[in-house]
């Protein structure tokens, strides 16, 4: 099976920008680049093996098909839904946040 295309939503891209800004400001360029590399590895894994993500929050939030996958060495989770022809990335959130509250945040904010 060939990898599916990863399509992050606008809010997911903002999450990434915020995380990179945080690492640049508080931990330096090396940490920020490491975050980007970890996200790229997570995306590649999800593209090839979308069913391996955890469905935990799908049940908690009543969002069928929602899965999450952790970034290695960074405390972030990628939240996504597998579609027929792509992976729909909803959010990239710090694992210590109130995930249900952040997932309910409207897309336009």
Put a short name on every predicted segment:
Residues 1-66, 100, 108-109:
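Basic, Lys/Arg-enriched alpha-helical interface segments
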Residues 71-109:
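Enriched for short, Lys/Arg-rich terminal
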